[in-house]
């Protein structure tokens, strides 16, 4: 099963950090920026008509995977974006009531 994971899509985009020391941009902000990159890539791919899914998991940051993609030990693979095309129409998701999660203040 593990060996077939890369075959699930014709293209996989790897999102990884490349931490840079900067007194005004701490590592956690750089990590969050990588997450924003992934989300914006998903939006861009969908706008171009592609199907994509952002995956992570226990194998994502193993030394072997990091080495394969040239990600150094101190950096993080934030996700793999599996990308391709499909004629399948995805069903609409049910709208989630955000009132349990969001608090509005004035």
Feature map (PLM): residue ranges:
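Glycine/small-residue-rich phosphate/adenosyl-binding loop
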Residues: 1-34
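Acidic, glycine-rich active-site loops and adjacent beta-strand->loop/helix elements
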Residues: 19-20, 58-62, 87
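GST superfamily/GST-like fold recognition
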Residues: 29, 50-64
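Aromatic/hydrophobic pocket-lining residues that form π-stacking "cages" and hydrophobic walls in ligand
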Residues: 40-41
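Short hydrophobic alpha-helices that are characteristic scaffold elements of the AMP-binding
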Residues: 46-47
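Short, electropositive alpha-helical surface patch
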Residues: 65-78
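C-terminal helix-cap and adjacent tail motif
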Residues: 76-106
């Amino acid at each position: 099963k593990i060996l077939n994971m890369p075959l699930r899509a014709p293209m996989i985009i790897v999102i990884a950090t490349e931490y840079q020391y900067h007194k005004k941009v701490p590592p956690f902000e750089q990590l969050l920026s990588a997450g924003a990159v992934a989300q914006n890539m998903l939006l861009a791919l969908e706008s171009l008509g592609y199907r994509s899914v952002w995956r992570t998991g226990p194998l994502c940051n193993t030394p072997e995977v990091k080495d394969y993609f040239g990600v150094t030990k101190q950096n993080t693979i934030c996700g793999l974006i599996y990308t391709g095309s499909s004629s399948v129409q995805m069903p609409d998701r049910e709208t989630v009531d955000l009132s349990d999660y969001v608090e509005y203040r004035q």
